[in-house]
């Protein structure tokens, strides 16, 4: 089946021996998503750069390590497989689309566009600006690793569909001052104010948060 990650079909292969895994991975390493409850095989997948899902059996105490860990298979659909594939190969998740916008995770190549947006007059009148470039780069590296990868949410980027222009940031985060409750935050590029983008995107994010 075709989907956004380029996965054209799903084939399930039962692997009983490590040799069979190596033979399969050598032929189609970018076309495999591996699922196992065996940490040794999951480690093999990591070593040959194959996306892996760990099945954590409910009765076991040992915690498995992989790109994703599941305790059941109800959530393992094509969207879930796409997320695993993208996370493994550092492809930013597209969170949602609205009529005019695409909301997706930040990747490091977005940094120049982010600095350009924050340089617009009035952009930081009511919020903090960015760090110096190198410090911001390190901050975003840590954010991608610790927020996106661990929690699966955070502050995302907002792009105008028609032009591909970065027009803002929006997302949800836990706030300690709110007793750990979720807070919706957003910032729209100054030159795109008063066009309904904030309302459009925030409504979609609230709906997304309720569903997931």
What are these regions (language model features)?
Residues 68-191, 203-208, 212:
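GNAT-family acyltransferases
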Residues 49, 152, 194-196:
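Glycine-centered helix-boundary capping/hinge motifs
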């Amino acid at each position: 089946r075709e989907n956004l990650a380029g996965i054209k079909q799903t084939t399930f292969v039962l692997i009983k021996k490590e040799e069979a895994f190596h033979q399969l991975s050598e032929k189609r390493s970018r076309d495999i998503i591996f699922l196992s409850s065996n940490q040794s095989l999951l480690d093999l997948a990591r070593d040959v750069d194959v996306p892996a899902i760990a099945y954590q059996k409910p009765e076991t105490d040992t915690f498995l390590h992989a790109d994703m860990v599941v305790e059941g298979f109800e959530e393992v659909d094509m969207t879930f497989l796409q997320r695993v594939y993208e996370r493994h190969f550092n492809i930013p998740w597209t969170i949602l689309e609205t009529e005019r916008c695409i909301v997706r995770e930040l990747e490091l190549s977005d940094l120049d566009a982010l600095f350009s947006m924050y340089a617009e007059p009035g952009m930081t009148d009511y919020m903090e600006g960015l760090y110096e470039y190198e410090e911001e780069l390190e901050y975003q590296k840590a954010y991608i690793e610790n927020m996106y990868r661990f929690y699966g949410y955070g502050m995302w980027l907002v792009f105008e569909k028609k032009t591909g222009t970065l027009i803002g940031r929006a997302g949800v985060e836990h706030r300690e001052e709110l007793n750990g409750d979720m807070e919706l935050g957003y910032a729209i590029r100054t030159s795109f104010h008063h066009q309904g983008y904030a309302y459009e995107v925030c409504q979609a994010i609230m709906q997304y948060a309720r569903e997931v």
